[in-house]
Regions:
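Conserved donor-binding/catalytic core segment of Leloir-type glycosyltransferases
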Residues: 4, 183-215, 221
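An aromatic- and histidine-rich active-site surface loop
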Residues: 68-82, 86-115, 273
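Membrane-proximal helix-turn-helix segments that form the acceptor-binding/catalytic region
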Residues: 79-82, 105, 128-146
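Nucleotide-activated donor-binding/catalytic signature segment of Leloir-type glycosyltransferases, i.e.
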Residues: 233-256
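Aromatic "clamp/platform" in nucleotide-sugar-dependent glycosyltransferases that forms part
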Residues: 270
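Short hydrophobic beta-strand element within catalytic cores of glycosyltransferases
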Residues: 287-290
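Conserved acidic donor-binding segment of nucleotide-sugar-dependent glycosyltransferases
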Residues: 304-312, 320-326
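A short, well-ordered alpha-helix in the C-terminal region of glycosyltransferases
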Residues: 327-342, 351
Length: 373
């Protein structure tokens, strides 16, 4: 098959979950002999990029501006893919749902992965939230097949729009590579890790305020950035005490080294479906604490310690886990076991592959002379 992946910032990953998804799934498709093209935004591409060279990159214009960047780049990508020889399009992000029609008009099946409920993010207010609500509505019918990454999101689309969807999650295997902590000045197994884009709905302020009340000499390592709001980052830094280390965004071997050697991982995102950072922490054999939302509970279940959105509860849960090495060891083992059983990239890629084949076969049955490649 010839597969196009559209709607992310591109590969290699320098931003977030969809980019990690595109990076991993494209390589798995290439492993199976498929021709894969990832459409990448110009602002996120560098001459020295390291990525799987079996995957073709197509660079499209971008604005690197919060409100229009996604639409501008995806419009150009959708037009280009419409005139390409790709057999199927994997479109990412609910905000891109209006552009599903462009390749569909040219006979290409479009699978839309909507992720979570983006319109609820605090950064989208007023007109922005209304536009995303419109995109959410369009996502319920604009693609050939809708994909949600959690049962909670599937149930939402079914209840609100009457739209069926296929639930396909994410993978979490630890890659091979340099997993040393050289340069971080951290002791393996003796730091708390928080990973997220630094935005209000990811609750870095909750974690930082709670940490001030935890009695421990462990560092809290905050990994993440916000290229669209530097002021918010400065406000978060003002909440940290001398035990907090802000690293900015980290990808590749450095990111995986921090995951692998953390003693505790605290997760505080409340908007979205399945979050890659959470399942990656589980795969890394971490003791996990997570904010109690339906999506997070579906992901981690009893393999982590859940807390409600309050400083008091998070402080108490952190203190309890930090004070008991045996509990940390038990939590880490359960998290790893759950990740290995439920979140494997090869299985995820195979599920998408079968879905693509089904859609292409259905299309070809309506078009005499066509056959599945």
């Amino acid at each position: 098959m010839k597969i196009a992946i559209v709607g992310t910032r591109g590969i290699p990953n320098r931003y977030g979950g969809f980019e990690r998804f595109a990076e991993q799934i494209s390589s798995r498709f290439a492993d199976q002999g498929h021709e894969v093209t990832v459409y990448c935004r110009r602002a996120f591409v560098r001459p020295d990029d390291v990525y799987d060279r079996r995957v073709r990159r197509v660079i499209v214009p971008s604005l690197h501006q919060k409100h229009l960047d996604t639409w501008v780049s995806t419009f150009f990508a959708a037009v280009r893919v419409a005139f390409s020889n790709n057999d199927v399009v994997l479109l990412c992000n609910v905000a891109n749902s209006p552009f599903a029609y462009i390749p569909r008009l040219f006979g290409k099946p479009v699978v839309l992965n909507v992720d979570g409920l983006d319109r609820k993010r605090e950064k989208w207010k007023g007109l922005g939230a209304q536009v995303l609500h419109f995109c959410e509505w369009m996502s319920s019918f604009s693609s050939t097949r809708l994909v949600t990454d959690a049962k909670a999101i599937r149930d939402y689309y079914l209840a609100k729009y009457g739209s069926e969807s296929t639930v396909i999650g994410y993978g979490s295997e630890m890659p091979a590579g340099d997993d040393s902590l050289n340069g971080f000045n951290l002791e393996p197994g003796r730091y708390v890790l928080y990973v997220s884009r630094l935005e209000p709905e990811n609750n870095p302020d909750l974690v930082l305020r709670s940490w001030r009340n935890v009695r421990s000499d462990w560092p809290l390592v905050v990994v993440g950035d916000n290229p669209y709001d530097r002021g918010y980052i400065e406000r978060m830094k003002s909440l940290g005490d001398e035990r907090v280390r802000f690293t900015g965004a980290i990808y590749g071997d450095g990111y995986w080294a921090l995951q692998k050697h953390a003693g505790v991982f605290v997760f505080a995102c409340e908007i979205g479906g399945v979050h890659p950072a959470l399942i990656e922490a589980m795969a890394a054999n971490n003791a996990v604490l997570y904010l109690d939302t339906p999506e997070n509970a579906e992901t981690a279940g009893d393999a982590g310690v859940k807390y409600v959105k309050s400083e008091e509860d998070l402080t108490a849960k952190l203190q309890s886990v930090l004070d008991d090495p045996a509990v940390r060891q038990q939590l880490a083992a359960r998290a790893k076991e759950r990740a290995d059983a439920l979140y494997r990239w090869d299985v995820i890629a195979g599920t998408y592959e079968k879905l693509f084949e089904e859609l292409i076969r259905s299309r070809n049955e309506r078009l005499p002379g066509k056959r599945l490649q």
